[in-house]
């Protein structure tokens, strides 16, 4: 049998200012902290941009070399594919320093001009290629919440109040 708890721990109480002046001071402090966080984020983004710019120039020629070498390797492998794949029996060849492989991608569909394609499919009687999505109309439920009151899985929430703190900020007009 489990022992009953000797001591019940409760969460520490959150900080609550005790008067109007403390609230005013705390709102000012929130604004100060938000501005400081914004300054630090800007400084961080500036540093990231500097690092990116510094390394981008060094990375670009390396990427070009990789692309050139890759095209050359692919060209040689295509010319010698029959030998590398044992007459098409395997799809991968081990070349000591790495593997080369050939894979056929699965079929895919791309559609340009969705509305025009839909109209054409309907006109040609090819509705089987058109998917109709059913979904619950939440806007209608909000207009008639009593009609769905007994339906399991539907909860209409109303009267929820959000509290927000908006410290005053002065715009520089820049």
Curated annotation (Swiss-Prot):
Listed InterPro entries: Host-nuc_inhib_Gam (IPR009951)
Principal location class: host cell
Induction: Expressed in the early phase of the viral replicative cycle. Expression of early genes is repressed by viral Repc (latency) and favored by viral Ner protein.
Coiled coil location: 26-56
Listed GO CC annotations: host cell cytoplasm
Keywords: Coiled coil, DNA end degradation evasion by virus, DNA-binding, Early protein, Host cytoplasm, Host-virus interaction, Inhibition of host innate immune response by virus, Viral immunoevasion
SUPFAM superfamilies hit by this protein: Gam-like
Compartmental location: Host cytoplasm
One annotated GO molecular function: double-stranded DNA binding
Keyword GTP-binding (UniProt): no
Gene Ontology biological process terms in this record: DNA protection; symbiont-mediated evasion of DNA end degradation by host; symbiont-mediated suppression of host innate immune response
Assembly and binders: Homodimer.
Function, as annotated: Protects linear double-stranded DNA from host exonuclease degradation. Binds to linear dsDNA irrespective of the precise architecture of the DNA terminus but not to RNA or to ssDNA.
Protein name, UniProt field: Putative DNA ends protecting protein gam
């Amino acid at each position: 049998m489990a022992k009953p708890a000797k001591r019940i721990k409760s969460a520490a109480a959150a900080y609550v200012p005790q008067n109007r002046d403390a609230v005013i001071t705390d709102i000012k402090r929130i604004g100060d902290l938000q501005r400081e966080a914004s300054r630090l984020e800007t400084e961080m983004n500036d540093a990231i941009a500097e690092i990116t710019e510094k390394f981008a120039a060094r990375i670009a020629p390396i990427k070009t070399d990789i692309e050139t070498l890759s095209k050359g390797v692919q060209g040689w492998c295509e010319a010698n594919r029959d030998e590398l794949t044992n007459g098409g029996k395997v799809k991968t060849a081990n070349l000591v320093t790495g593997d080369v492989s050939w894979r056929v991608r699965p079929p895919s569909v791309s559609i340009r001009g969705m509305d025009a394609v839909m109209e054409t499919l309907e006109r040609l009687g090819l509705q089987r290629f058109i998917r109709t999505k059913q979904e619950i109309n939440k806007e209608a439920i909000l207009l008639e919440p009593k009609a769905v009151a007994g339906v399991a899985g539907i909860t209409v929430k109303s009267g929820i109040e959000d509290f927000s703190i908006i410290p005053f900020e002065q715009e520089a007009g820049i």
